Amino acid sequence: VELIGLLALSILLGLRHGIDLDHVAALADITGGSSGSKKERMKLSLWYAGGHEAVVFVLGCSILVFAWSVPIWADQWMGKAVGITLIFMAILILIGRRNGNGAYWSRGIAIFQKLRRRNGEPFTFTRRNVFTVGVIHGIGAETPTQLLLFTTVAGVAATNHGMLAVAAFSIGLLLSHAIIAIVSIWFHDLAKKVRPLLPVTMYAACLFSFVLGVSYLLE
């Protein structure tokens, strides 16, 4: 009974952690790309989620097995790095970058296009780079729900039960990310149908990312 309660709590914490603002901003960016089908954008979102969830699982297990977690100073710097990234991507969309078809690039596509080019072609999202972004977000900016999970598993006597709790948290997190991705894809596509050359959701996401990035820097 205690194990079932622990797993249920972990899943709920994972669902709650999945709707943290930095996750929403990242998934809105990935799903807001002007190219790619719904299926392709959903796959990329799941790769981002996979990177994030993998880090959470490793960190949780490291607490159980080695009694080790990310140092406070490292977590603070990673949080600020996330903030800088969000601000930089928001500024890029504001300068009105366009692709060859006249549609606006998403913030993430714009930043990757500016930082790197492959074979002369604009650099866009791939499984590898969205997975990497997920890993970075998993390390930085630990939230109360994530810290509560780590505190809970640290107090579990049986290591295998603690690992099950971390796995349950990751499952809840994955479900939350999947739902956000589906909703985000739907909103972006709806906005493109209404105003193809000026999708409102892109600019709303841009403002959201900028404000969120500033808040991370001020923490």
Where are these regions (language model features)?
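Juxtamembrane transmembrane-helix termini in multi-pass membrane transport proteins
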Residues: E2-P71, L147-M163, F187-H188
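Membrane helix-loop-helix hairpins that form the core translocation module of multi-pass transporters
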Residues: G5, K39-R116
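Alpha-helical transmembrane segments of multi-pass membrane proteins, especially transporters
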Residues: L13, L44-Y48, H52, V133, ...
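Short helix-coil transition sites and intra-membrane helix breaks within transmembrane domains
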Residues: G14-D22, H137-T143, H177-I179
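Divalent metal-coordination and catalytic microenvironments
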Residues: D20-H23, H52, I87, E142, ...
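Transmembrane-helix boundary and interhelical-loop signature of multi-pass inner-membrane proteins
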Residues: G32, G60-T85, I95-G100, T152-M163, ...
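Core segments of transmembrane alpha-helices
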Residues: V56, F131-V133, H137-L148, A205-S209
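Alpha-helical multi-pass membrane helix bundles of inner-membrane/thylakoid proteins
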Residues: I95-G138, K193-P196
